[in-house]
Curated annotation (Swiss-Prot):
An example Gene Ontology molecular-function term: polypeptide N-acetylgalactosaminyltransferase activity
Lineage: Eukaryota, Metazoa, Chordata, Craniata, Vertebrata
UniProt cross-references to SMART domains, sorted A to Z: RICIN
Glycosylation sites: N95, N552
Residue ranges of the TM segments: 9-28
The gene coding this protein: Galnt1
Residues in Ricin B-type lectin domain copies: 429-551
Alphabetical list of Pfam families matching this protein: Glycos_transf_2, Ricin_B_lectin
Keyword Ubl conjugation applies: no
Cystines in this chain: C106-C339, C330-C408, C442-C459, C482-C497, C523-C540
Protein name: Polypeptide N-acetylgalactosaminyltransferase 1
SUPFAM superfamilies (UniProt xref): Nucleotide-diphospho-sugar transferases, Ricin B-like lectins
Source organism: Rattus norvegicus
Function: Catalyzes the initial reaction in O-linked oligosaccharide biosynthesis, the transfer of an N-acetyl-D-galactosamine residue to a serine or threonine residue on the protein receptor. Has a broad spectrum of substrates such as apomucin-, MUC5AC-, MUC1- and MUC2-derived peptides.
Length: 559
């Protein structure tokens, strides 16, 4: 009996295990089918394994790449090729994982299903294989498949063999149509982008540089804004990819685009008025006066309507401000979409050379945008950069005609309504040199940067570094920097203008010719013997060394 009972227990236990095995087999078989159905039903870009799963390997999750000491010399030599750490880039996978750097409120936003399609246009010239293909793979892996019409790679006359047939063979295997378009000769970013835009088929054109990495959820918020209003031109937050280590660092949603006196693009803090307009919701787009220009999306038809790029501009430089002014002045809107993040390798120097040099090219381009879009404010720019007035800027009649056709607003409207915190002083007592009566020398910013001392040098009468504005707010400005003194008998430093008076408040007496620093009650004096090129403040004595002539610079002769 015992033996029979024991057999029954063994048999029953075995039966339980058999039934359990069958259940598990059927369960996981069905789960696999469900997963297969789920993956087939989702757009390729929504399967986020390549995006969110941490991988092992150099640079994964955006971590910095550390080069061993024994390879440092080779790394330095390779760095010169593209002006970034090529060795580090080649160690990183094309589909490396990146952190989700979006604001928490962005991660739960829901976008319409019927968003427009986009063609992604990427111009390259002698780009590194690894950075170019990492850009392409990040677009494919992190974008809903049905939203990507195509990727258009425009080769601006590259000389490297691997960017010829090997590139064409590689991109044919990708799951998104990728077209390689060749420029017959070196044409520059502007004309190469125009070529890419001309062959694109998507409802939206998205321009990217050739050394970018898109993050999860980058595309939908851009397309959603254009669907909401086709005259809205949108930029992602541009995250920083280190040129030294390829570390991925989130960009700030608290900065927007502006420009300085020399029409150089600059990032500035988002002003309080824009925060108030968004009611403090940082997930809402920021209206930006200008864009950096490398990364943006625009409705394809609208791009044509507002005049694409100025084809009379050469190579690169100034085109971002020109299109920014045009968008705003001609009825469009320019935004930074804070829920979209795209990384960009920021280089300290360019590896490219340009016929005639970059200075000549940028001067020509800036002259064109000033003549067409800046009205009387162009004269302010010419005083700051008199060399611009000497360049041949070509025929602008078609661009002037475009402005009239589109019935665009004046530049004064742009400054008052879109960029009231512009660095261009609209109300001032003087704009020009500040000359010391005793030494006959002029204040000079010496091309120094923020937190450095203002200088004094022989007056040259050519504007540029010796142009200062004594504003209606009683600031002494040189570009976006104001003369600031923080201690008695101290030197005069240049700090960002804060418009709060304090250490940046100066009182000019046109009779005594003194510039009195109000907070300290001392007067601006000539340089001391200890430091012959740095003025300071001293107790007011009425001496000639404390007398200054504020002279308006006359407009240079314009050709």
């Amino acid at each position: 009996m015992r033996k029979f009972a024991y057999c029954k227990v063994v048999l029953a236990t075995s039966l339980v295990w058999v039934l359990l095995d069958m259940f598990l087999l059927l369960y996981f078989s069905e789960c696999n089918k469900c997963e297969e159905k789920k993956e087939r039903g989702l757009p390729a870009g929504d399967v986020l394994e390549l995006v969110q799963k941490p991988h092992e390997g150099p640079g994964e999750m955006g971590k910095p790449v550390v080069i061993p000491k024994e390879d440092q010399e080779k790394m330095k030599e390779m760095f010169k090729i593209n002006q970034f750490n090529l060795m580090a880039s080649e160690m990183i996978a094309f589909n490396r994982s990146l952190p989700d750097v979006r604001l928490e409120g962005c991660k739960t936003k829901v976008y319409p299903d019927s968003l427009p399609t986009t063609s992604v246009v990427i111009v390259f010239h002698n780009e590194a294989w690894s950075t170019l293909l990492r850009t392409v793979h990040s677009v494919i892996n992190r974008s809903p498949r049905h939203m990507i019409e195509e990727i258009v790679l425009v080769d601006d006359a590259s000389e490297r063999d691997f960017l010829k047939r090997p590139l064409e063979s590689y991109v044919k295997k990708l799951k998104v149509p990728v077209h390689v378009i060749r420029m017959e000769q070196r044409s520059g970013l502007i004309r190469a982008r125009l070529k890419g835009a001309a062959v694109s088929k998507g409802q939206v054109i998205t321009f990217l540089d050739a050394h970018c990495e898109c993050t999860v959820g980058w595309l939908e918020p851009l397309l959603a804004r254009i669907k909401h209003d086709r005259r809205t031109v949108v930029c992602p937050i541009i995250d920083v990819i280190s040129d030294d280590t390829f570390e991925y660092m989130a960009g700030s949603d608290m900065t927007y685009g502006g420009f300085n006196w020399k029409l150089n693009f600059r990032w500035y803090p988002v002003p309080q008025r824009e925060m108030d307009r968004r009611k403090g919701d940082r997930t809402l787009p920021v209206r930006t006066p200008t864009m950096a220009g490398g990364l943006f999306s625009i409705d394809r038809d609208y791009f044509q309507e507002i005049g694409t790029y100025d084809a009379g501009m050469d190579i690169w430089g100034g085109e971002n401000l020109e299109i920014s002014f045009r968008i705003w002045q001609c009825g469009g809107t320019l935004e930074i979409v804070t829920c979209s993040h795209v990384g960009h390798v920021f280089r300290k120097a360019t590896p490219y050379t340009f016929p005639g040099g970059t200075g000549q090219i940028i001067n020509k381009n800036n002259r064109r945008l000033a003549e067409v879009w800046m009205d009387e404010f162009k004269n302010f720019f010419y005083i700051i950069s008199p060399g611009v007035t000497k360049v041949d800027y070509g025929d602008i009649s078609s661009r002037v005609g475009l402005r009239h056709k589109l019935q665009c607003k004046p530049f004064s409207w742009y400054l008052e309504n879109i960029y009231p915190d512009s660095q261009i002083p609209r109300h001032y007592f003087s704009l020009g040199e500040i000359r010391n009566v005793e030494t006959n020398q002029c204040l000079d910013n010496m091309a120094r940067k923020e937190n450095e001392k203002v200088g004094i040098f022989n007056c040259h009468g050519m504007g540029g570094n010796q142009v200062f504005s004594y504003t209606a707010n009683k600031e002494i400005r040189t570009d976006d920097l104001c003369l600031d003194v923080s201690k008695l008998n101290g030197p005069v430093t240049m700090l960002k203008c804060h418009h709060l008076k304090g250490n940046q408040l100066w009182e000019y007496d046109p009779v005594k010719l003194t510039l009195q620093h109000v907070n300290s009650n001392q007067c601006l004096d000539k340089a001391t013997e200890e430091d012959s090129q740095v003025p300071s403040i001293r107790d007011c004595t009425g001496s000639r060394s404390q007398q200054w002539l504020l002279r308006n610079v006359t407009l240079p002769e314009i050709f």
